[in-house]
Amino acid sequence: TKAQDRRFDVTLMINGLPMIHIELKNKQHSYMDGFWQIKKYIGEGKFTGIFSAVQMFVISNGVDTKYFSAASDTELNPKFISGWLDNENNPVPDYLDFAKSVLRIPEAHEMIARYTVLDEEAKRLILLRPYQIHAIEAIREASKMGKSGFVWHTTGSGKTLTSYKATRNLLMDIPSIDKAIFLIDRKDLDTQTSMAFQTYANNDLVDVDKTDNVFELKKKLKSDDRQMIVTTIQKLQR
């Protein structure tokens, strides 16, 4: 097929803009065929113009369904492909079940608006993985009921990104919250976390402030600004 004759399978539009693109294969083919096809389309310049708005790709052969964030053809990497899991950690490979869980309204809207991050430093779009999304949703539900709890993560599972989005979403979703405070238990992580949060916030709608000392922390807590504050337990204890 000539490059000019390419025809996309399915594109989902939000407010008139193409945001989610789906490539479908039959069961005799691997879902990865869809990945390589998308990579080829990007290299051919098919996702330009209005289609440059696409933020999420979905690939499926009917029985295996995956998703990943948009990137250039040279940056598109299979390691960023993720399958969907329900909140009990059960895989959701079937394309219809995936569509019901992820691509309905408002789930598709939330995936794009609430669970996508533009990493300013890496110059890369990030789509959160299912366990991160379920953790953030659990935090939101607990906050509505005035409850607290723990979210357990392992090394390399994206704890900082999960923490940023959880803190950010609480601040954006609940008008009565004036300050969202991210508390760190080790001083050496203060600067590191603040820099990561700022990298995520540079293209977001929230202000992230790092506190250099106790005096500055008190000043920020008393201010009328709605903001996200990164600080340490040590500063609060003084």
PLM regions and their residue ranges:
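ATP-dependent helicase/translocase motor core
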Residues: 1-179, 188, 192-203, 224-228, ...
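Conserved H-loop
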Residues: 185
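Short acidic loop-to-helix transition motifs that present clustered carboxylates
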Residues: 189, 210-217, 236-237
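Acidic/polar loop patches that form or flank catalytic/metal-binding clefts of enzymes
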Residues: 203-210
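Conserved motor-coupling elements within RecA-like helicase/translocase cores
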Residues: 213-229
